[in-house]
């Protein structure tokens, strides 16, 4: 049985809205990553209000233990989205898309060797949207840590430079 996914490729019908939102950020000299963090925070607040038994308002996370529990839950959700992403790379319009990550499937080599560019545009978008689903949960972890886009950039910049230095030093 093929796993059921949200079919997100059709969301691109609203691409003009997304492009306009990006332009609005840039025109306002706003960091688009900060806008994404704010959008995700608002979603989590809404979920906490609608379904308080299973969702928390990230603004209420105060202790290291609460943040740990939150991050562990996000990692569980990411793990699910990772598997969906792997399956989507098999092409959701194909009869056995999970053959790409199941080496015991007869179609395994065929699916692994298929060029991404050979997938239909819709299948390519599904794979990309599954990756975006993971970003939602990474953003939740960022929110829990109280980070913004500027801090993320600066810390990433420093860590990336360190990673290059390590490689130059035989790491």
Describe each PLM feature range.
Residues 1-171:
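Flexible "arm" and connector segments at domain edges
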């Amino acid at each position: 049985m093929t796993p059921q996914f949200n079919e997100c490729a059709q969301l691109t019908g609203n691409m003009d809205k997304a492009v306009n939102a990006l332009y609005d950020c840039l025109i306002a000299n706003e960091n688009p990553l900060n806008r994404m963090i704010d959008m995700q925070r608002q979603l989590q607040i809404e979920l906490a209000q609608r379904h308080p038994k299973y969702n928390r308002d990230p603004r209420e996370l105060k202790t290291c233990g609460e943040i740990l529990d939150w991050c562990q839950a996000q990692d569980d959700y990411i793990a699910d989205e990772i598997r969906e992403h792997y399956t989507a790379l098999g092409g959701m319009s194909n009869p056995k898309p999970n053959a790409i990550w199941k080496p015991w499937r007869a179609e395994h080599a065929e699916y692994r060797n298929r060029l991404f560019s050979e997938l239909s545009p819709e299948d390519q978008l599904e794979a990309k949207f599954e990756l975006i689903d993971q970003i939602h949960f990474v953003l939740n972890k960022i929110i829990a840590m109280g980070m913004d886009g500027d801090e993320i950039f600066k810390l990433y910049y420093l860590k990336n430079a360190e990673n290059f230095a390590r490689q130059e030093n035989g790491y």
